[in-house]
Regions:
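Ligand-site clamp/hinge motif
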Residues: 205-211, 236-282, 293
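Surface-exposed binding/hinge segments that line
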Residues: 101, 124, 133-198
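Aromatic- and charge-enriched surface segment that lines or borders ligand/interaction sites
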Residues: 87-139, 171, 263
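Ligand-binding "clamshell"
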Residues: 25-26, 281-293
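N-terminal lobe/hinge region of extracytoplasmic solute-binding protein
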Residues: 39-94, 130, 137, 215-217
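A structural "hinge/loop" feature
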Residues: 29, 44-62, 85, 112-116, ...
């Protein structure tokens, strides 16, 4: 079963900038959670403020784009790579070497815990990626050695070196060409950190705070975090693209499910992210609200453990695929907000194969194939996610 999910956001009055966060020191709480701000209601937990250390969740989906920037970005309409912190780049050695030329006008955020003394430079990029890829780097094991996204790709094994050529030029050398390399650097998992901030924490012997008290170059910076309640983001006045229009964004974590819907309907939220599909009728019928949908880059699918018999047999996996009624799932689970996918890649991906075929629903054929393989009364254990985006 593979489903391409749509991104769902309900907007009351105005559009939001997305926002995300993790653990940072508590500040004095304002009497009013709004405090002249914009309230974005979303469900999720914050375990880290560093998207490199997360596999998914609030920091990746919402906060990373507010706190940090990457070398590259992906245009949301054309799905093509576009410059971000790197204003240009070169592909050399048939795709085994990548050279990035950095912008010279990018400032890090000035927070209660850090005041930068310089602009972004090559040292920050080298520090960021050496920490991820070099297992001997002094920062690699801080807050655990796991970098889930890059670990899952065994990415470090293909990175030979990350080095500074000059103050504004960084070069990545790979062990072999990789056509997907640039696309990985455009994910939020490749957010760029401050080497100067890391050096300050090292002098204080407080290295663990790098992932808990974030400092980035993004449009908003962390101002206040109340675990399980809200995250307050303050405008980064020195943002290189220009000062954000909103002085602050509040990410409301306090309610889930119908609680978030109630907050939207009573005006406590300006935006409700990822509403449950079962709530769409209510949202569509309310003239005060605007529901926006667009194809997502995410998918839901049934992943087989191919190390375990009989799932190591492709014929068994095909027989199981024949037994799944995708169209029924589209309506009963996703209420028409998803489409059956023919590939593990979403349609919006640059690598999507338009010739990929969708497995038909044919339970009789499924039973016959399993019987021919000598399999009856097959019992499988399923692990399923519990998040609202599952």
């Amino acid at each position: 079963m593979r489903l391409v999910l749509s991104s769902l956001i309900v907007i009351a009055g105005l559009l939001s900038s997305q926002a995300t966060a993790a653990t940072a020191p508590e500040q004095t709480a304002s009497a009013d959670i709004r405090d002249s701000g914009f309230v974005y209601c979303v469900s999720g937990q914050v375990n880290t403020f560093n998207p490199q250390k997360a596999s998914s969740g609030l920091i990746v989906d919402t906060l990373a784009a507010q706190l940090y920037d990457r070398l590259l970005d992906v245009d949301p309409y054309t799905y093509r790579l576009v410059p971000e912190l790197a204003e240009s780049w070169e592909v050399l050695d048939n795709g085994a070497t990548y050279r990035f030329h950095l912008r010279r006008d990018v400032s890090f955020q000035k927070t209660a815990w850090f005041t930068p003394t310089r602009k972004l430079n090559a040292d920050d990029v080298v520090f960021t990626f050496q920490r991820i890829f070099d297992r001997r780097h002094p920062w690699h094991n801080i807050n655990g050695s796991s970098f889930p996204y890059f670990d899952s790709l065994q990415f470090a094994d293909n990175v030979k070196s990350v080095r500074k050529l000059d103050n504004n030029t960084v070069e990545f050398r790979l062990t072999q060409p990789d056509a997907s390399f640039l696309w990985h650097l455009a994910t939020h998992y490749a957010s760029v950190m401050s080497a100067e901030y890391a050096a300050q924490l090292s002098r204080k012997d407080r290295q663990e705070l790098l992932d808990r008290q974030p400092v980035g170059t993004g449009p908003f910076q962390l101002s206040e975090y109340r675990a399980g309640q809200f995250i307050r983001l303050q405008r980064h006045d020195g943002f290189w693209r220009g000062k954000p229009l909103m002085p602050q964004v509040v990410v409301d974590l306090g309610s889930g499910g119908t609680g978030r819907l109630s907050k939207l309907l009573t005006g406590e939220c300006d935006v409700l992210a990822w509403p449950a599909a079962s709530q769409l009728t209510i949202l569509r019928d309310d003239p005060r609200l605007r529901l926006t949908l667009r194809p997502g880059m995410n998918i839901a699918y049934l992943a087989f453990n191919t190390d375990k018999p009989p799932l190591n047999n492709p014929a068994v996996r095909h027989a199981l695929a024949l037994s799944i009624n995708n169209q029924r799932l589209m309506q009963s689970i996703y209420y028409g907000t998803a489409e059956t996918a023919a590939s593990i890649l979403p349609r919006a991906s640059w690598a999507y194969d338009n010739d990929a075929k969708i497995t038909e629903y044919n339970p009789q054929k499924s039973r016959e194939q399993l019987k021919a393989l000598g399999i009856e009364n097959l019992t499988l254990h399923l692990w399923v996610p519990t998040s609202s985006q599952a």
